[in-house]
Amino acid sequence: MLTQQELKQQAADAALELVEQVAGPDVIIGVGTGSTADLFIDGLACFKGRLRGTVASSERSAARLAGHGLAVLDLNDVQSMPIYVDGADEIDPNLHMIKGGGGALTREKIVASVARRYICIADESKLVERLGRFPLPVEVIPMARNAVARGLSRLGGQPALREGFVTDNGNIILDVAGLSIADAPGLEKTINDIPGVVTCGLFALAGADVALLATQDGIRRLERRG
């Protein structure tokens, strides 16, 4: 039986096959953040010299990419990318996701928005029927912490400060347990509209286009309906 780490590697390898299909001297690949994304980055090293470069969603991923000799570009200098590859903390059959366990949710949303296709890579344990067992990360401007926490509580959530953590943008994270996420796009908009919220870790208004889920029997591929 494959371990979870081996399943993550399987998912990363499947995404590298998609990179092989689009690789070229003018191609830029968007790269996410997290343990599965790290494995993708390590595999991407074999494309050194075959890509124009990469765009990273965090300082952590940028450092790992640079360590492999891959060019890391400023998103402001990039007009489009064929694919953005990232993991997920949870993903449902509609390819809506909860992300942000690594705290890079805002930059992940920004980089993903520039890519033509969002490729989610994960092991099968991340697939759920309904989002919400994983606490929802919310990036918050520090001065608004208590006001935002009250707003999240009114939505039925139980927000907790992620102690000792500061995002790459200089903000804090509230991890929100207990939310009922029957309408992920609607809840994403509602939370994002709370003054002081930078963004929440729901990726539903713009979810994944393709999910590559590693199972004991190989890769299960899901594509966004419609």
Curated annotation (Swiss-Prot):
Domain of life per record: Bacteria
Function: Catalyzes the reversible conversion of ribose-5-phosphate to ribulose 5-phosphate.
UniProt keywords, alphabetically: Isomerase
Residue numbers binding substrate: 33-36, 86-89, 99-102, 126
Keyword Isomerase attached: yes
Gene3D superfamilies (UniProt xref): 3.30.70.260, 3.40.50.1360
Coiled-coil annotated spans: none
Quaternary structure annotation from Swiss-Prot or TrEMBL: Homodimer.
Gene Ontology cellular-component annotations: cytosol
Enzyme class: isomerase
Catalytic reaction equation(s): aldehydo-D-ribose 5-phosphate = D-ribulose 5-phosphate
Pathway annotation from the record: Carbohydrate degradation; pentose phosphate pathway; D-ribose 5-phosphate from D-ribulose 5-phosphate (non-oxidative stage): step 1/1
Transmembrane segments: none
EC number from the UniProt entry: 5.3.1.6
Family as reported in the entry's similarity comment: Belongs to the ribose 5-phosphate isomerase family.
Gene Ontology BP terms: D-ribose metabolic process; pentose-phosphate shunt, non-oxidative branch
Record GO terms (molecular function): ribose-5-phosphate isomerase activity
Catalytic residue positions: 108 (proton acceptor)
Name by which UniProt lists this protein: Ribose-5-phosphate isomerase A
Organism: Bordetella pertussis (strain Tohama I / ATCC BAA-589 / NCTC 13251)
